[in-house]
A protein has these predicted regions:
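Generic beta-strand or strand-like secondary-structure segments
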Residues: 59-62, 84-88, 104
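Transmembrane alpha-helical segments that form the membrane-embedded catalytic/substrate-channel core
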Residues: 54-64, 94-96, 140-152, 193-215
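Non-catalytic, topology-defining segments of multipass membrane proteins
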Residues: 1-54, 88-191
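Short acidic-hydrophobic sequence patches enriched in Asp/Glu that either
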Residues: 74-81, 94-97, 199
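Active-site recognition of the HExxH zinc-binding catalytic motif
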Residues: 62-69, 73, 105-106
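Post-HEXXH active-site segment of zinc metalloproteases
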Residues: 74-88, 117-120
Length: 215
């Protein structure tokens, strides 16, 4: 029992270096994918680039989840800034809003007050289990074709913070990045990024929430 307690305590400690390295690897893969799109300038290549970007966006969201649990740094302000800047803000996710949503999920898991179940119930029977491979494949194709945008918007509405001040930094960040890319004739990067955000990111996100245990 003592060994288990020791292992649990070690896992509960912030892991800044591991988090930063994982974040850099994901952004490196995204940068390489974007370079491939620039180099080949081919629609088929763009399709696979969007798949890769969406997959790595999902990985960044998982790193953001760790940051929401304060697993990045003991300094909470530093923890939240890094989590937002490198993981959540580029995805359009607000950290305080997500944290409230997610912590309530842990507190009310499996009950009628569980916000994740509320979201799933709004799209019933899409999340009705068991979910066969054929149905999962059909949902994947639907998501890739950007036919689940409404569902993405529903989830975004669940994580909007109540305090207006919590919107300032993320909006300034997004506005600055968008302006810099457009001014440098890199609007195509925005197009690929946002298409991935509402298609392949959601496709991989759906797969995970359908196969992971509830908790």
């Amino acid at each position: 029992m003592n060994d288990i307690d020791t292992q649990l305590k070690s896992l509960q400690k912030p892991a800044s270096l591991r988090w930063v390295l994982a974040c850099l690897v994901n952004w490196g893969i995204i940068a390489f994918a974007l370079y491939c799109a620039y180099f080949f300038q081919n629609l088929l290549v763009d399709f696979f680039v969007i798949l890769v970007i969406g997959n790595r966006q999902h990985a960044l969201a998982l790193l953001g989840h760790e940051g929401a649990h304060y697993m990045l740094s003991a300094n909470r302000r530093w923890n939240d800034f890094l989590t937002g800047f490198f993981a959540f803000w580029p995805l359009g996710i607000n950290l305080p809003g997500y944290r409230k949503f997610h912590f309530l999920h842990h507190l009310k898991v499996g009950t009628k007050a569980d916000p994740e179940l509320l979201h799933k119930n709004m799209k019933f029977p899409d999340y009705d289990l068991p979910l066969g491979r054929l149905k999962m494949a059909m949902f994947f194709i639907k998501d890739i074709l950007c036919l689940s945008v409404y569902e993405v918007l529903i989830l975004i509405s669940f994580v909007i913070p109540k305090r207006k001040t919590d919107l300032i930094l993320p909006n300034v960040f997004l506005g600055s990045v968008i302006a810099l890319l457009i001014l440098n004739d890199l609007g195509w990067v925005l197009i690929l990024w946002f298409i991935a955000n509402i298609s392949s990111f959601w496709a991989f996100f759906r797969i995970r929430i359908n196969i992971e245990p509830i908790g």
